[in-house]
Amino acid sequence: MSARLQDHFNNVEKILNGFSVECYVAYGEINISIKDQRDIHLVLKKLKKEYHFKQLTDITAVDYLTYGQSDWQVGKVVSQTGFSRGRQQGFKTADVNNRFEIIYQLLSMANNVRVRVKCKLKDAQIIMVDSVEDLWPSANWAEREVYDMFGIYFNNHPDLRRVLTDYGFVGHPLRKDFPQTGYVEMRYDENLGKVVYEPVEIDDRVNAPRVIRNQ
C-alpha cells in the first residue's frame, strides 16, 4: 500500500485500540471488521469524532444464506458451454449465527480517506443493531432501506418503516430465500374497479444462474 494509506491505516488502528476489531486493506481501502455487534455504534462514533469521518455514504447488508452454493458447477467459460433452463433449487440451511453482515461506508473529507466498516450479525432470527441516525442524519433512510430489503431492525431509529416496497408488503426482497417472482402479483380488476393482489402463478426458474467456476 502507499505510504499515505499506510499512515491512515496506522492512525485508524490506533484510534480503535481497545475494541475487538480487525483492520486490513482491500481494494485500496481500509476495512474494519467489528467482532461484536454491540460495539458498532461505539466504533462508528469514535471514527467520526477522532478521525473526522463526518460523511456516511452508504449502509447496506449481505445475506450469506447461499454463499458457496451454485446452480451449476463449471470448469470452463460459460459462453463456451451454455446452460439449460432449470427450476429454482431449494436452499440449504445456513449457519444461523453468520448469515447476515452489515456494512457502513464512511468518508473523511478532512483526511481524504474512506473506510468500510463491517460486522457479522450473530442472530439471524431477530436481527437488531443500534441505529447511527444520531451520528449521521443520512442514516435515517439508509437504515429504513436495509430494514425493508433485509429485515434488519435498528434500535432507537425514529421512524423505522418500509421505504421502497408497497404498503402491506410481505417479506424482504434481498434475502436469499425470497423468491424471485415474489409471493403475490398485482393487476387492475375492471369489474371491481381497483387493483387486486393474487398469489403468483409463475414457477421460480433460474434465469441468471449463480455460478462457481473452478479455475
UniProtKB/Swiss-Prot annotation:
Protein location: Cell inner membrane
Reaction equations catalysed: a quinone + NADH + 5 H(+)(in) = a quinol + NAD(+) + 4 H(+)(out)
EC numbers, comma separated: 7.1.1.-
Keywords: Cell inner membrane, Cell membrane, Membrane, NAD, Quinone, Translocase, Transport, Ubiquinone
Similarity comment: Belongs to the complex I 30 kDa subunit family.
Entries under PANTHER family matching the protein: NADH DEHYDROGENASE [UBIQUINONE] IRON-SULFUR PROTEIN 3, MITOCHONDRIAL (PTHR10884:SF14), NADH DEHYDROGENASE UBIQUINONE IRON-SULFUR PROTEIN 3 (PTHR10884)
Protein name: NADH-quinone oxidoreductase subunit C
Organism this protein belongs to: Francisella philomiragia subsp. philomiragia (strain ATCC 25017 / CCUG 19701 / FSC 153 / O#319-036)
Organism lineage: Bacteria, Pseudomonadati, Pseudomonadota, Gammaproteobacteria, Thiotrichales
